[in-house]
């Protein structure tokens, strides 16, 4: 019964997140098209660079949110309202201090804007305006939005989607209209970010009327919950590794190229981020369920669910990456024009990187559920390898060199180390089980690609005259691959069939 409830909540969260995902995805691509048409690639590249600079300052967040989330699972399971209030109060106290660090750091950073954006052909105030709006939006998460962590940890993330995402959709629509019809859309952007934050804060208060944060007790609570402070310190190093992976690349690319190349890279990254967001919408709602499962302590059930989730996520990852490689260039041509297409090697490097990033999520979800953040050398090593190789290889091969540096660091730390750490420290299983599981799934994925192209030999091919017809043919190939892969995953007895039976059992129980 508990398992069915956990699964039911996960499905509800996923369905709501998916609905908002598809609406938001359309608006994102349309708004980017409006940006390019009315503001140009230079301003778009500026916005990407300003975002990355702010993300650097957000390293000060130290991973407090993740530390709080894994600490909340047990009191939420036991309905311990006193502990919940104290933990969220400690989070608010820590976030207030982080907010002031971000403010001071931003002021110092803005003093160097004349040198950072020396090559920019736009007026310097554009950089200050872009960064300022992004800064205010970020500060709202420290002063107002931090309480949403309770909704996520309690598997009620759909309430965040209802209120916050709806406000974000309205914000994006107004931003598009402002850019098209007004001289400056930044004011609209800022106003709706504030409104969305206030709506979310009200939703949390209505859902948890007992939730009363007392920030004045912060220092006292930090002594009462030393495990949280310890996890925060450990997570700081993991944040560094994550930042080096996701946020330094555009800055290094800009150092070796131009804002226009950053914009081209940003177009492709928008497609990839769309895929990552889709996977997040489908699977992240299950993370709180994993935390709840770990809190119960049933080792056999924990391992069984791991195998199911690994299989399902691997299936989706293969489909997504196949589609990205097949369809992205054609989509970019249809979306913004042929001049924004990058070479095949760049796309291949981005696709392989995406494959590793998406496949890591099952291991990461379990690491977060266990609060297993003690391997602080791993993110430091990852960040060092990433930055050093990106700078070195970027010097010789430009954009592709930077991407290769990212890929190598991911392979060594995320692909090789993280599964070993989880299986040894938490699951208490031999790594051999994971390796066999991975090899089986990867072999099926490769065989499915071979079968797909074998079938295509019997399908008449034409020299397509338009990008649209080529795109439609690419969609057909992707669907064919999906059907073959899905059939093989199900009938070969991988974890997918157990997951499907679990869903069927839950649905039958509702009838």
Predicted regions and their residues:
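Membrane-interface helix-loop junctions in multi-pass transport and translocation proteins
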Residues: 36-38, 42-43, 158, 169-201, ...
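Membrane-proximal transmembrane or re-entrant/amphipathic helices at the cytosolic face
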Residues: 1-2, 427-430, 452-511
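Interhelical loop/hinge segments that connect adjacent transmembrane helices in multipass membrane
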Residues: 1-10, 186-187, 203-247, 289-304, ...
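Helix-loop junctions and terminal segments of transmembrane helices
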Residues: 62-78, 153, 212-213, 272-311, ...
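Transmembrane helical elements of multi-pass membrane transporters/channels
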Residues: 12-32, 167, 192-209, 222-292, ...
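Signature of the first transmembrane helix
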Residues: 6-74, 103-109, 137, 171-172, ...
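N-terminal membrane topogenesis motif
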Residues: 1-29, 82-93, 125-127, 208-209, ...
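Hydrophobic transmembrane helix module of multi-pass membrane transport proteins
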Residues: 95-248, 352, 381, 454
């Amino acid at each position: 019964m508990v398992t069915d409830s956990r699964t039911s909540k996960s499905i509800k969260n996923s369905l709501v997140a998916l609905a908002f995902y598809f609406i938001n995805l359309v608006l994102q691509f349309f708004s980017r098209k409006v940006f390019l048409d009315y503001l140009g690639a230079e301003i778009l590249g500026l916005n990407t660079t300003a975002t990355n600079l702010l993300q650097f300052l957000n390293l000060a967040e130290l991973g407090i949110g993740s530390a709080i989330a894994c600490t909340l699972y047990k009191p939420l399971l036991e309905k311990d309202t006193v502990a919940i209030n104290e933990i969220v109060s400690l989070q608010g106290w820590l976030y207030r201090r982080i907010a002031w660090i971000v403010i001071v750091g931003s002021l110092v950073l803005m003093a160097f804007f004349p040198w950072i954006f020396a090559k920019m052909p736009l007026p310097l105030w554009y950089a200050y305006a872009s960064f300022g709006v992004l800064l205010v939006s970020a500060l709202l998460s420290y002063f107002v939005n931090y309480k949403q962590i309770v909704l996520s940890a309690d598997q009620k993330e759909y309430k965040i989607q209802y209120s916050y995402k709806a406000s974000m959709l309205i914000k994006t629509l107004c931003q598009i209209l402002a850019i098209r019809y007004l001289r400056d859309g930044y004011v609209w952007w800022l106003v709706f970010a504030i409104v969305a934050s206030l709506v979310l804060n009200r939703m949390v208060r209505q859902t948890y009327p007992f939730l009363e944060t007392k920030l004045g007790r912060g220092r006292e609570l930090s002594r009462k919950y030393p495990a949280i402070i310890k996890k925060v310190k450990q997570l700081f190093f993991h944040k560094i590794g994550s930042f080096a992976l996701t946020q330094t690349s555009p800055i290094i690319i800009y150092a070796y190229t131009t804002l226009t190349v950053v914009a081209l890279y940003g177009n492709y990254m928008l497609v990839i981020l769309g895929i990552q967001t889709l996977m997040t919408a489908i699977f992240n709602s299950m993370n709180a369920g994993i935390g709840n499962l770990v809190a119960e302590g049933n080792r056999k059930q924990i391992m069984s669910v791991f195998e199911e989730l690994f299989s399902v996520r691997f299936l989706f990852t293969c489909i997504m990456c196949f589609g990205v490689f097949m369809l992205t260039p054609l989509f970019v041509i249809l979306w913004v024009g042929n001049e924004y297409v990058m070479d095949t090697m760049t796309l291949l490097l981005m696709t392989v990187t995406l494959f590793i990033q998406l496949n890591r999520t099952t291991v990461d979800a379990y690491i977060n559920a266990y609060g297993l953040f003690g391997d602080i050398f791993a993110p430091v090593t990852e960040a060092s390898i990433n930055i050093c190789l990106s700078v070195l290889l970027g010097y010789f091969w430009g954009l592709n060199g930077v991407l290769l540096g990212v890929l190598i660091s991911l392979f060594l730390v995320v692909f090789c180390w993280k599964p070993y750490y989880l299986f040894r420290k938490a699951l208490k299983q031999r790594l051999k089980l994971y390796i066999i599981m991975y090899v089986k799934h990867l072999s099926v994925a490769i065989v499915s690609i071979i079968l797909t192209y074998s079938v295509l030999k019997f399908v008449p091919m034409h020299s397509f005259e338009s990008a649209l017809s080529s795109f439609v043919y690419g969609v057909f190939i992707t669907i064919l691959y999906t059907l073959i892969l899905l059939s093989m995953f199900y009938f070969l007895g991988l974890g997918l069939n157990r997951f499907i039976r679990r869903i069927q059992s839950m649905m039958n129980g509702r009838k």
